[in-house]
C-alpha cells in the first residue's frame, strides 16, 4: 500500500509514526525552526524560525511544500558517538577519519602543566556524548543530541553499511553520496516534527475572528496577546529564537569540532553542487493537505499558546527541553484522539463521544491506585480511546475506484489495507507515546489504564498557569479538561463516563485528593481553606 492511501495518514497527517520517539518529534520540529527555509526552491530563503506572518497564507495552499535545509553535522556526531556505538557499525573509514579529526583538533589546543591534549579531547568528547538524545544502540550517525542549541540539531543520516568496501575512505564515500549515506529515508525523524511545524503555520494563518470563535467554543482562557494570531506569532518567534540561542558556549565548542575539517564533510552533505556553486540541500515536507489535516488548526492553535508560554519561562536548559518534550507528548495524544473523534462525529459512527470541543476525555488515576473503582474507570477510559482510534481509522476506504472494488470483494485486501495503519500509526502511537511518558501503565501486560504522574502534572501547571501566578484549583481542573481532555475529580469523571456510554458508580467525593496532594508536595498548591486552594506556577518569566 502506498502512504497516500494509508488511512492513518489520511486522518492524522504524514506522518505520526509509532517508531519516532517523543524527543525525535521535538528534535525534528526544532530542526526545521533552525534551518534555512523556503516555500519555493527557486525563491528566497528565510532564516527566521517561522515564516513571516504576512507570508503564511501563500505557503498553505493545496500542493504547497515547505522546504528546509538541515545540517548533517557528521564530524560532530563522529567525534562524539563513534566510541559508544555498536562495534559492528564502526567502519574502518570512520575510525580513520576520527583519528585525523582528533589529530587536527589537537594542533589547535594549548595546555598547561601536565594536562595531556588527549585528555582534553576525551573530556570534550564526553561532554557531547553526555548530551546524547535519541538513538542509543543505533549507528553513530543515526543518533541525535539533546536539542539544546542550533548546533545540537542535525538531520537524519544513515550509513549504508552493506554498500561499503574495504578500500573505501571517508572522502571517497562522499563522491557517490547517495550510495553510502541516506539522508531522506525518514526512518527516525519520520516527519512527525514536520506535521506539527506545519500545523503551527496553519493555526497562525487563521483570522482573529476564527480564533475568537475557537476561544468561545472551547471555553479557553487566553490573554489578549494569545488571542491575536499576529501577536502570538511574534511571541513564538522570540521564544524559539531564544531557545536556539540559549547555549552559545556549547555552540562555540561544537563549531570548534566541526570547522576543524575546513567544513569538507559539511560541504559534501549540506550543499548541492550545480555549475561549480553550492546551495543548501533542501528537504521537502509533504504537500498540503496530506502533510497536515487542515481541520487540525484548532488544536494547533491551542498547542501554539501552550508552547509560547513554556518558551517564555525562565527554566534550566535541560528542564526546558524536558518540559517541551512532555508538552509534545500531550499534544501528540490530543492530536490523534481529537482527529479520531472528529472523524467519528462527521461519519456518524455509532460510538459515543465526550460532549466537549475535543470530543474525548481521559479518566486518570494515581500511579499506585488503591481505589478499585477509580482504577476500573481509568481502564474503561483507556479501552474507549482505543476503540475510538480503531473505529476512526477503519472508517476509511480506498479513494481509487479499482482499489475500492478490491476492498469490498476481498477480506485479505481489507486486512492488508489497515495493516500498516494498525501496526505503526493511530492507536500504536497513542500506546507508545503514552507508555513512554508514563501516562499509560503498566508498560507491559494487561489492564492498561491512564495515570497522572508528577512529571505530567508539572507540565500541565507550566502550560496552563501564568508564570509566577496562581489560579484556583477549580479553574485549574477546568483548564486541564478544556486543553487536554484530562479529568480526575468526581463530577467530571461521572460526566465523562456517562457521555461515553459507560455505567459509573459514584467514585466518591474525595476522589481527587491525590492530585492536590501531589501539587502540594511539589510546592504548586497554596491551601487557603478546606474548600478553596490556589494552584501556583513557581517559574518566573524570562526577561532577557
Show the residue positions of the predicted features.
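Charged, amphipathic alpha-helical stretches
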Residues: 1-126, 130
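Intrinsically disordered, low-complexity serine/threonine-rich regulatory regions of eukaryotic proteins
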Residues: 78, 83, 97, 101, ...
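Eukaryotic partner-binding/assembly regions in large regulatory complexes
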Residues: 165, 183-440
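Extended, Lys/Arg-rich, non-catalytic nucleic-acid recognition/anchoring regions
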Residues: 112-221, 226, 230
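Alpha-helix boundary/N-cap detector
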Residues: 20, 44, 69, 73, ...
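Generic structural signal of hydrophobic/aromatic residues within well-ordered alpha-helices
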Residues: 26-29, 46, 56, 78, ...
Amino acid at each position: 500500500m502506498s502512504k497516500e492511501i494509508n488511512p492513518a495518514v489520511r486522518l492524522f497527517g504524514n506522518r505520526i509514526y509509532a517508531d519516532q520517539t517523543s524527543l525525535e518529534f521535538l528534535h525534528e520540529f526544532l530542526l526545521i525552526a533552525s534551518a534555512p527555509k523556503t516555500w519555493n526552491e527557486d525563491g528566497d530563503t528565510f532564516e527566521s524560525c517561522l515564516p513571516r506572518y504576512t507570508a503564511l497564507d501563500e505557503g498553505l495552499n493545496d500542493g504547497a511544500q515547505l522546504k528546509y535545509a538541515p545540517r548533517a553535522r557528521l564530524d560532530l556526531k563522529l567525534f562524539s558517538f563513534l566510541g559508544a556505538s555498536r562495534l559492528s557499525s564502526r567502519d574502518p573509514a570512520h575510525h580513520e577519519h576520527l583519528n585525523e579529526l582528533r589529530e587536527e583538533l589537537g594542533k589547535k589546543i594549548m595546555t598547561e602543566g601536565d594536562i595531556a591534549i588527549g585528555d582534553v579531547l576525551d573530556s570534550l568528547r564526553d561532554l557531547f556524548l553526555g548530551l546524547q538524545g535519541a538513538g542509543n544502540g543505533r549507528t553513530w550517525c543515526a543518533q541525535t543530541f539533546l536539542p539544546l542549541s542550533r548546533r545540537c540539531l542535525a538531520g537524519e543520516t544513515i550509513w549504508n553499511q552493506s554498500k561499503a568496501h574495504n578500500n573505501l575512505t571517508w572522502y571517497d564515500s562522499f563522491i557517490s553520496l547517495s550510495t553510502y549515506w541516506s539522508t531522506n529515508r525518514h526512518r527516525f525523524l519520520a516527519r512527525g516534527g514536520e506535521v506539527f511545524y506545519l500545523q503551527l503555520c496553519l493555526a497562525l494563518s487563521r483570522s482573529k475572528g476564527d480564533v475568537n470563535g475557537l476561544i468561545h467554543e472551547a471555553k479557553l482562557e487566553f490573554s489578549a496577546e494569545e488571542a491575536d494570531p499576529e501577536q502570538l506569532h511574534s511571541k513564538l518567534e522570540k521564544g524559539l529564537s531564544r531557545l536556539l540561542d540559549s547555549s552559545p558556549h556549547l555552540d562555540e565548542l561544537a563549531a570548534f569540532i566541526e570547522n576543524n575539517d575546513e567544513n569538507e564533510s559539511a560541504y559534501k552533505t549540506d550543499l548541492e553542487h550545480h555549475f561549480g556553486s553550492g546551495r543548501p540541500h533542501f528537504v521537502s515536507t509533504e504537500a498540503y493537505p496530506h502533510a497536515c489535516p487542515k481541520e487540525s488548526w484548532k488544536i494547533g492553535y491551542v498547542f501554539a499558546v501552550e508552547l509560547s508560554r513554556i518558551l517564555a519561562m525562565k527554566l534550566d536548559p535541560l528542564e526546558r527541553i524536558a518540559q517541551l518534550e512532555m508538552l509534545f507528548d500531550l499534544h501528540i495524544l490530543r492530536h490523534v484522539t481529537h482527529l479520531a473523534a472528529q472523524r467519528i462525529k462527521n461519519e456518524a459512527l455509532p460510538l459515543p463521544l465526550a460532549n466537549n470541543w475535543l470530543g474525548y476525555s481521559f479518566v486518570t488515576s494515581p500511579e499506585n491506585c488503591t481505589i478499585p473503582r477509580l482504577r476500573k474507570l481509568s481502564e474503561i477510559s483507556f479501552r474507549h480511546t482505543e476503540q475510538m482510534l480503531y473505529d476512526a481509522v477503519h472508517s476509511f476506504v480506498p479513494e481509487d475506484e479499482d482499489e475500492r472494488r478490491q476492498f469490498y470483494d476481498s477480506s485479505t485486501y481489507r486486512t492488508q489495507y489497515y495493516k500498516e495503519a494498525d501496526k505503526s500509526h493511530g492507536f500504536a502511537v497513542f500506546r507508545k507515546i503514552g507508555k513512554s511518558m508514563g501516562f499509560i501503565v503498566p508498560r507491559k501486560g494487561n489492564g492498561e489504564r491512564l495515570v497522572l504522574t508528577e512529571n505530567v502534572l508539572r507540565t500541565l501547571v507550566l502550560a496552563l498557569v501564568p508564570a509566577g501566578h496562581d489560579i484556583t484549583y477549580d479553574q485549574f481542573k477546568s483548564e486541564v479538561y478544556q486543553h487536554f481532555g484530562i479529568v480526575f475529580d468526581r463530577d467530571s469523571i461521572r460526566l465523562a463516563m456517562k457521555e461515553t456510554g459507560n455505567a459509573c458508580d459514584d467514585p466518591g467525593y474525595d476522589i481527587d485528593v491525590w492530585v492536590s496532594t501531589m501539587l502540594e508536595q511539589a510546592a504548586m498548591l497554596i491551601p487557603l481553606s478546606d474548600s478553596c486552594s490556589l494552584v501556583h506556577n513557581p517559574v518566573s518569566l524570562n526577561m532577557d
